[in-house]
Structure formats: C-alpha cells, structure tokens
Amino acid sequence: MRTVAAALLLALSLTPALAQDAKIGRQKAQACMVCHGQNGLSTQPDAPNLAGQPAMYISNALKAYRSGDRRHEMMAMMAQTLSDDDIQNVAAWFSSIRIEAHLPR
C-alpha cells in the first residue's frame, strides 16, 4: 500500500512540471507553427499535423532530423536549433493539444 501511495504522490508531483514544459514548448514552437499550424493542424500540404501526436514520436523525429538519421532539409535546419530540453518541451506542447475526430456517416 505504501508503494502505491508513493507512486501516486510522485505522479501528482510531476503534473505541474509537465504542464510547464508544454507552456515553454508552445513558446519555443512558434517557428514550427508556420508550417504545422497555430493549433498543430498543418497549413502546408507536405507538413504533417502534430496536434495530439505522442510526445515520444515528436521527440524521436526531431532528434532524428537533428542527427541526420531522418532527412528533410527544412526540418534538419529547424531541429539543429533545438536543445534536448527544447525538443522535450515542443513535443509536450504538441502532444497536449486535444483534437476531435468526426467520422463520416
């Protein structure tokens, strides 16, 4: 029982940090929004929507662009400007955006 209580306390203590990371990420993601949209929904036909994507997916993609393991000229240049903390914060921001899907009838 103590283990469960300790885990719950730890999880609750991390929540404000995650919210703050997303807030910082939103500020850092201003350049991203030119192509990926203010709300994470792309304004460019060749740029994917980032709203609601898992943070790990976004983080891994940015790190791969930065290292050259994944190739795209613009994304490589953008990722080069981001620190590891920046990448985590940007990923937290885009993953925190909630989207709603409507299925066709």
Where are these regions (language model features)?
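Bacterial N-terminal signal peptides
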Residues: A5-S13
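C-terminal capping alpha-helices of c-type cytochrome domains
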Residues: M56, R70, Q80-R105
